């Protein structure tokens, strides 16, 4: 019994050490998600204004821009998959990877070749394990992306979108990311990034919001040509921010669950340790009483 008691105490110390780690990770995620949510909210006004400017420029332009022109035959589709660099975030990465697999199957059923572009080490590990070819990948910033990260990705995608099929070009670009709804809910989503579908008309203003009037210098064509790459980068940046907030929320929730489970396990092991200690004490008392009885019996015979 003494050996069993030592084993229980050793397990309790181990679980307590793990609990300290999960609790610390929970607090770190909770503090960082506040900034991540603020970044998502801060990027919305710029994205809305840029959407309106692009829509207005497109409606006043005669430019047949390649980023807004539907191709007659789509041979190759790019899929930008936004995952995480680290684990311990529950089903966050597996959910977005599953959505990516669903999109890939749909595009292949339409006869399109897939060109994967990956964000995050989890997506890279997923593709490497299955020995799948990847066009490009980025990592190291999934929980705190910057606009420069989005611009790097956007520039590569726009460059490949402008290439011919024989040179490795793509005809469509889709983005798979996790949309942040709330601290409890995060949803994997798919958007078609290119060709742009949002420039068919000017976005309607909100209640009480004035519709801006645009004057284009030197021309609507020149403004549209300058705005479209920025618009692509802005949408990618928003997707990365949404994914970062979702990752941190999922990690906080997973670490809180792990901490709660550690508390329950410590209670269970403590109860078992107390039972083992009580059994040891009972056994020792029995041995003492037995020894005293034996001594008393031998003394009475003498």
Swiss-Prot record:
<keyword id="KW-0375">Hydrogen ion transport</keyword>
<dbReference type="Pfam" id="PF00231">
    <property type="entry name" value="ATP-synt"/>
</dbReference>
<protein>
    <recommendedName>
        <fullName>ATP synthase gamma chain</fullName>
    </recommendedName>
</protein>
<keyword id="KW-0066">ATP synthesis</keyword>
<keyword id="KW-0406">Ion transport</keyword>
<keyword id="KW-0813">Transport</keyword>
<dbReference type="GO" id="GO:0005886">
    <property type="term" value="C:plasma membrane"/>
</dbReference>
<keyword id="KW-0472">Membrane</keyword>
<dbReference type="InterPro" id="IPR035968">
    <property type="entry name" value="ATP_synth_F1_ATPase_gsu"/>
</dbReference>
<dbReference type="GO" id="GO:0045259">
    <property type="term" value="C:proton-transporting ATP synthase complex"/>
</dbReference>
<dbReference type="InterPro" id="IPR023632">
    <property type="entry name" value="ATP_synth_F1_gsu_CS"/>
</dbReference>
<keyword id="KW-0139">CF(1)</keyword>
<dbReference type="GO" id="GO:0042777">
    <property type="term" value="P:proton motive force-driven plasma membrane ATP synthesis"/>
</dbReference>
<comment type="similarity">
    <text>Belongs to the ATPase gamma chain family.</text>
</comment>
<dbReference type="GO" id="GO:0046933">
    <property type="term" value="F:proton-transporting ATP synthase activity, rotational mechanism"/>
</dbReference>
<comment type="subunit">
    <text>F-type ATPases have 2 components, CF(1) - the catalytic core - and CF(0) - the membrane proton channel. CF(1) has five subunits: alpha(3), beta(3), gamma(1), delta(1), epsilon(1). CF(0) has three main subunits: a, b and c.</text>
</comment>
<dbReference type="InterPro" id="IPR000131">
    <property type="entry name" value="ATP_synth_F1_gsu"/>
</dbReference>
<keyword id="KW-1003">Cell membrane</keyword>
<dbReference type="GO" id="GO:0005524">
    <property type="term" value="F:ATP binding"/>
</dbReference>
<comment type="function">
    <text>Produces ATP from ADP in the presence of a proton gradient across the membrane. The gamma chain is believed to be important in regulating ATPase activity and the flow of protons through the CF(0) complex.</text>
</comment>
